[in-house]
Amino acid sequence: MLERIKVCFTESIQTQIAAAEALPDAISRAALTVVQSLLNGNKILSCGNGTSSANAQHFAASMINRFETERPSLPAIALSADNVLLTAIGNDRLHEEIYAKQVRALGHTGDILLAISTRGNSRDIVKAVEAAVTRDMTIVALTGHDGGELAGLLGPQDVEIRIPSHRSARIQEMHMLTVNCLCDLIDNTLFPHQEV
């Protein structure tokens, strides 16, 4: 058992090192894209399933409340946070539409959709991205593995942050770190003189 624990930590560290080499440009581009959208008076919608939903909600909470420093609230909505709405849509046998319907109702030109999917193939996330495209929104996608179907939907203005791993647990860990990194970069760009 002790050896298994060491393997988990070693794999996580190796994935972090690989991501630190591969992802800075994409993370920087994503942060600047979000900052520009916010400066233009737009908002961020975030979505994901399971652990990805938790990461999407963490991002929205960090935007509205704060990340590490006190600052004005920033407009963000976690589309997975309203259980009544999700079950109402899902009850009508439209599970694939649980996020797309919200994107069509709440998303506007210039808004950002933060779409988080470990493998990039979750039908409801893919449908949300398709809806965001029709609303002329910009997509920031957190994926892993080979990016899945989601990666193929992205245009030149969109940003994919693809974790260099095939293991779901490692991808999810790196998604959380990436969300924290995005929050830090957004805060430090918009409010450069705030103290931690």
Curated annotation (Swiss-Prot):
RNA-binding listed as a keyword: no
- Some GO term, biological process aspect, for this entry: which one? carbohydrate derivative metabolic process
Q: Which residues form the SIS domain?
A: 34-196
Q: Is tRNA processing among this UniProt entry's keywords?
A: no
Alphabetic keyword roster: DNA replication
Annotated InterPro entries: DiaA, GmhA/DiaA, SIS_dom, SIS_dom_sf, SIS_GmhA/DiaA_subfam
PROSITE patterns membership: SIS (PS51464)
A single Pfam family it belongs to is SIS_2
Gene Ontology MF annotations:
carbohydrate derivative binding
Subunit details for this protein?
A: Homotetramer; dimer of dimers.
The family note in this entry says: Belongs to the SIS family. DiaA subfamily.
Task: Describe the task this protein carries out.
Answer: Required for the timely initiation of chromosomal replication via direct interactions with the DnaA initiator protein.
Q: Which NCBIfam families match?
A: PRK10886.1
Q: What is this protein called?
A: DnaA initiator-associating protein DiaA
Q: Which organism is it from?
A: Erwinia tasmaniensis (strain DSM 17950 / CFBP 7177 / CIP 109463 / NCPPB 4357 / Et1/99)
Protein's gene: diaA
